[in-house]
Amino acid sequence: MKTKTRQPTGGTTAAIGSAPAPWPRVSASPTNAGSTERPEARPSRGTIYGRLFARFYDGAMKQLEREGGAELRHNLLAQASGRTLELGAGTGLNLEHYPEAVTELTLTEPDPHMVKRLRCRLEESGRDATIIQAPAEQLPFDAGAIDTVVSTWTLCTVDDPDAVLAEVARVLDTGGRFLFLEHVRSEDSERTARRQDRVTPLVRRAICGCRPNRRTLATIEASPLELEHVRWGEQPKGSLPWEKPMIVGIARKPSI
């Protein structure tokens, strides 16, 4: 079993029921290609708070996983293949769901406390993978190096979703797929949407940057990716009331 951890060096729509320093971009080699300031602040990843959040994350997700979250992961990740990159891998809850069609797996995660727990889960899993401590806005890969990118409950937390999706499009090979599972701002209930707007400032501080009112589907549609399929639904029991609206889908990097 091979476990590697590396830190950077420098459509269709169907409706159904901190690191304080900037992160450098590197290539897979790696070689330093500059750095970019992160646009928004969030609770420090090096604090006691960050350590506690990582410690209790799996417990907080337990009911959601049992009530259908694990099945959602499994069904989505069954479509992953080839060189696969996961954004915001957290503690590694997706690991057991990757199919044999995945020939090379890389897990990115910016939080050092999450990385520690991710490494332990990877070692226990017995699968071959590489862990890279890096944010989704600055992926350490050459253009066209990836066949599948995965994001499960990650785009709500990133500082700049437009930059993330631009990076996803950059690293994907032509025809490569972006598999996503995200909670989003409600489009069916104005009452729910207003509640999400009200709680977002507090939730963002309390849950490591999570924005319940993010219009993630619109962001994907405006990205360089081509939406192939998306379905709407509600998250399973165990999710918070303002996190119920959910999208699951696939986008593809089109031919130029």
Regions found by a protein language model. Give the residues of each.
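C-terminal alpha-helical "lid/dimerization" subdomain adjacent to the S-adenosyl-L-methionine
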Residues: S44, R51, F56-R66, L181-W242
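C-terminal lobe and adjacent flexible extensions of AdoMet/dcAdoMet transferase-like proteins
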Residues: M246-I256
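A short SAM/SAH-binding and catalytic strip from SAM-dependent methyltransferases
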Residues: D147-D160
